[in-house]
């Protein structure tokens, strides 16, 4: 069969392989004939969404109608929570889409992007799709080395991606470090600060987003409803930035990109502050529990400010992952992030964490 059309694909796509999501519970049950599965692979909120979200979804009507293409009600709620104007907000089909929109808007084959090793893989994918050259900067203590970033910035740099906290390592950057970095670069460069896990951070020196946005017009903050809000299946996130910048990005955004159920669910979740606080507290308690267990096992891990822990194993992480699958535990191997001996584990409920530790002990013992 003649496939000459393949020679006309856009430059950069040749080197991309499709993103491999974590295995589903259904797939593992079927493949290994298991009845009990604990999924700790994708950094979802193990408590699920707020009951108020479930109520909104169950009562949803008018599914035959298109959603509000501008998301006015949701933007109004976000503007209240974030203390910004609705004109400073762009909605996305997950914050992932917002990252794609930013890349579409500012990257080309003639421009460059900068991001860290061991950072969210979408930064690299979004750059490659645009045919843009990218600089993957060596990490410092598993996190962003902003001084090294400066060494890779030139007149072609258009985008810089900073995840805070970083996924998959869980490291974070203090507010002052980010401010000093922003002051050191040209305001012609767009800096994307990805805060998908910001709600879980418990440090006094964490980024103060309003101060950043008020001082720097070249910054876009992205946030997600997939993590602490528990709305992963609905795909919804948003970006905040200077109104002029957001207006340009909205020219690229597809019509009706965020569905109506997701918009209503997001509003309900933002309204249930008590539930979000309870999710944060549960995560903190269970994170300490897992730290204690890993310490008892003499396993190294990267202290995390997210709802996940990056664990260094004495063996190949992919093999550990495969053995855990057979025992009914789904975690995330991260050799794609150049961390071949690490696995990333979502912090779950107590019974899930206990099951994981039990099966991890069995797996490590079987490797000796």
Pin down the residues of each PLM region.
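N-terminal "arm"/small-domain region of PLP-dependent enzymes with the aminotransferase-like
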Residues: 1-65
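Short acidic capping loops at alpha-helix termini that bridge into adjacent secondary structure
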Residues: 36, 85-89, 110-112, 156, ...
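PLP-dependent aminotransferase class I/II
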Residues: 50, 218-294, 299-302
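Phosphate-binding glycine-rich loop
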Residues: 67-112
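PLP-dependent aminotransferase-like
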Residues: 105-162
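Active-site pre-lysine segment of PLP-dependent enzymes
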Residues: 146-155, 168-191, 195-226
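Conserved PLP-binding catalytic core of the aspartate aminotransferase-like
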Residues: 284, 294-327
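PLP-dependent enzyme catalytic core of the Aspartate aminotransferase-like
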Residues: 323-327, 332, 336-368
